[in-house]
Amino acid sequence: MDKLEKSLDVWRELLSDERFRICRLGGTERAFSGEYYATSVPGVYHCACCDAPLFDSDAKYDAGCGWPSYFQPVAASALTSRDDYSHGMHRIEVLCARCDAHLGHVFPDGPPPTGLRYCINSASLRLKPRDEG
């Protein structure tokens, strides 16, 4: 997958204020407020910035944390990660591998088979429902 690079000014023009704050500035939406927190529609969640596929609904589960949670991405190559020491703690930030959009964080307290919990902002995602036929 080719890397997609745009300036912050271009992203600011392309995205809503909320998406820009979360995806490009590393913000976080309020818990239990996101569009996809409680949805159970079958499909694939894509990056809201570049449309890269990130998570399948088959890997989504209710972690009770207030954000959509997944136990694995569609492919390991879909995401990148880096250490995040903000807010006086250490976490692992998760980003879209194609455009470096901030998605959320990954924690080692998820269910089998991976034991991981990808805690993702709804604003960084777009759900493409599976076709009925």
UniProtKB/Swiss-Prot annotation:
Binds 1 zinc ion per subunit. The zinc ion is important for the structural integrity of the protein. The active site is at C119. One of its GO terms (biological process) is protein repair. Zn(2+) binds at C47, C50, C96, C99. SUPFAM superfamilies: Mss4-like. Residues 8-130 form the MsrB domain. Its cofactor is Zn(2+). It catalyses: L-methionyl-[protein] + [thioredoxin]-disulfide + H2O = L-methionyl-(R)-S-oxide-[protein] + [thioredoxin]-dithiol. GO terms for molecular function: peptide-methionine (R)-S-oxide reductase activity; zinc ion binding. InterPro entries: Met_Sox_Rdtase_MsrB, Met_Sox_Rdtase_MsrB_dom, Mss4-like_sf. Keywords: Metal-binding, Oxidoreductase, Zinc. It is an enzyme of class 1 (oxidoreductase). Its EC number is 1.8.4.12. One of its GO terms (cellular component) is cytoplasm. It holds the Pfam family SelR. PROSITE patterns: MSRB. HAMAP family: MsrB. Belongs to the MsrB Met sulfoxide reductase family. This is Peptide methionine sulfoxide reductase MsrB.
